[in-house]
Amino acid sequence: MRGFAHIGAIKSLEAHGIRPDMVVGTSAGALVGAVYASGKTPSEMIALADTVKETDLIEITPSQQGLIDGTRLRHYVNEQVNHRPIEAFPIRYAAVATQMHTNTAVTFRTGEAGLAVQASSSVPKLFIPPRIPKIGGKKYVDGSQVALLPTRIAKSLGADIIIAVDVMGEKQASPNSNALPTQGSSINIQRNHAGISATWGDKTMTAPVNLDKLNQTARGLPIDIPLGDLLGVIMQSIPTNTNISLPKQLPTKTSEFARWFGNLGANLTAEPEDIRAADVLIRPKMTGAAVFDSTDRTRLINEGRLATDAQIPAIKKAIKDAHTRKRTQIQTAQS
């Protein structure tokens, strides 16, 4: 995932003696930020990046609300932070999520870190939105819906100097709508022992599936047809290679389908106000990197480091200027 670039940015900052007092993250930034704020070193984070598997983070468990319930992601984060609450982290931390029904930003600054990251990373329609608290609480979805680059939120929490890492800043080529089939949009589904791959136009995405749990969960599940039928009985009645027509309620453009499936890198960009709120903006080269593609981890970490290395002079200047302003304010107040 593109979030691996955040690790490279952190590595560069610490290599130059710069350690943030607060970390505010959205989606993948919330995941990496939680692990870092809990006290993990860049070297430890790189080791985690090298060993983590998709199946450590996701498992398909279809329901009317989404395909992935986020429980594995939640447990993984809690394990990495040694099951400590956010308020026990050595670095202040906030995960940004979107309150689903009001479409407003919410920050999680205390409590269970894994649940905060799950909320911040729950891509609508792909992940089942967690309800917090579980009984009588509100539902939350991916923070990128309202704060892809949460710089203004960081400022509202008291940040003096904001170093922002925008892993969505690099524009991707727009899909060629002329290449789409004109009659009956369809998706090619293939399965094997490891999971399911879905091909839409020139895009292919693979999701690991626990086949036994998929069958058990989907049995008798009232999901909208035909997508529900596909997911519910795919292991019983659909061949290993087949084309399935998409229902009318699903997107009809490749870019929209990619977003629905979780490939948010196609079109999402930060709000201009959030870009302007950054004292220093770091934009790693993300060419060819999909949000859920974890096959190019070393390159993405390195791109994050290189992009941050290039901004170190600007970061140090911003820190110096902020200290100068603060001293001037103190002297003015005392005179």
Located regions from the model:
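Gly/Ala-rich beta-loop-alpha elbow adjacent to hydrolase catalytic centers
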Residues: 25, 29
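Patatin-like phospholipase
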Residues: 1-23, 34-335
